[in-house]
């Protein structure tokens, strides 16, 4: 019989696993190796573009890679997108010390070398269920992005397409070719 002890978000926050990416899925710890160079470069480039746009237009707050968001409780789920954005009207007056108990408006996932399609789809479903309005899954190997919206619609963007912030990140546009 396997160990069925579930971890809480508070326990995850205190966990010390340097050089690892951690998330909590329904109380179960998931530990992964860091993303590679391409993953990091694409996530940073897109995060920088989003941050510059958000600051220029005072749209809200951008969170860096591996910021955990507690999106389910009992058992806890803590997910950490590569980039996250929350709109200005949702920015808390006092930033939580631990994991925020709310979902961002935009979650960006840049696929890493060890990401599996079924796990990525599960993560997208969890983000949308938690209230994320727009999810971008960027695949640097295939040079594509998939856009998932809260209304259930989705789109596959090829290498020549442009990411659009729609009503979530108004005015933001980033050609995918700029990410590679």
Question: Over which residues does each language-model region extend?
Answer:
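Gly/Pro/Ser/Thr-rich low-complexity, intrinsically disordered segments predominantly at protein N-termini
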Residues: 1-180
């Amino acid at each position: 019989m396997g160990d069925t002890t579930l971890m809480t978000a508070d326990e995850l926050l205190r966990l010390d696993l340097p050089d690892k990416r951690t998330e909590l899925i329904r109380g179960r710890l998931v530990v992964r190796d860091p993303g590679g160079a391409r993953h990091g470069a694409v996530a940073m480039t897109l995060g920088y573009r989003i941050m510059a746009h958000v600051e220029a237009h005072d749209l809200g707050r951008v969170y860096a890679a591996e910021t955990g968001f507690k999106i389910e409780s009992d058992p806890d789920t803590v997910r950490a997108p590569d980039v996250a954005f929350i709109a200005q009207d949702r920015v808390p007056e006092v930033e939580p010390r631990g994991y925020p108990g709310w979902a961002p408006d935009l979650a960006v996932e840049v696929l890493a070398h060890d990401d599996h399609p079924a796990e990525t789809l599960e993560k997208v479903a969890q983000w949308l269920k938690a209230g994320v309005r727009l999810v971008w899954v960027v695949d640097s190997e295939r040079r594509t992005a998939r856009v998932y919206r809260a209304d259930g619609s989705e789109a596959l963007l090829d290498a020549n397409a442009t990411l659009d912030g729609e009503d979530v990140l108004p005015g933001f546009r980033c050609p995918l070719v700029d990410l590679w």
